[in-house]
Amino acid sequence: MTEKRKQRMKTRNVILLLLLIAAAYACFLPLPRSIHVTHSAVAWRNCDDANTPTSVTMDGIYFDYLFREDYFDGAITVSGFPETFKPLPRVTFHDGMGMLFYQGEQGLLEPMFGWIIPSPEGSAFTIGVHNEHGWSADTGLNITGPADNRYEAVQLANKLCQRYHPSFLGTWTFE
């Protein structure tokens, strides 16, 4: 083997190693997305036809990972729900669902407000609001947007649950 060929192979191996390191590094870096939106939304229950118009503001950064759980740093506020105007610690998403815990007095976490399933770009969401007994697919309060009426909210909630939280398939179907 000539000296020139050895040098080319050495250069090629170094370049391949650098590319491999860069690819591995890129796989573990997040893809951050700024989200600054206010959506019209509908608060509704699966057990009746009642619905209440509201709005939800998302303001923060969504960190989308390839091999880790995604998370959101920022604020999610719902008009008509004063408990959501408090600080919101980082929301980590497991299988597409995140839990909303707001901070109360002296920085202590209050009981869980609910869960959220957003689209990663923040263009749509559904929130299940917990009460003192938790949340039920049959009678629990949901807030879904963007939606202008109950029908749109139910359709969007079903779509989000099935797409971003696959374990819901066949378990929860909103009507």
How should these model regions be labeled?
Residues 36-38, 71-73, 124:
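Exposed beta-strand and adjacent loop surfaces of beta-rich binding modules
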Residues 11-30:
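Hydrophobic membrane-insertion alpha-helices, especially the h-region
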Residues 49, 53-104:
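Extracytoplasmic/periplasmic/luminal assembly and interaction segments
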Residues 88-175:
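Non-cytosolic head/periplasmic domains of membrane-anchored proteins
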Residues 1-9:
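N-terminal Lys/Arg-rich, disordered targeting/topogenic segments
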Residues 33-52:
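Tryptophan-anchored aromatic micro-motifs
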Residues 15-20, 35-37, 53-55:
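A short linear-motif detector with a strong N-terminal bias
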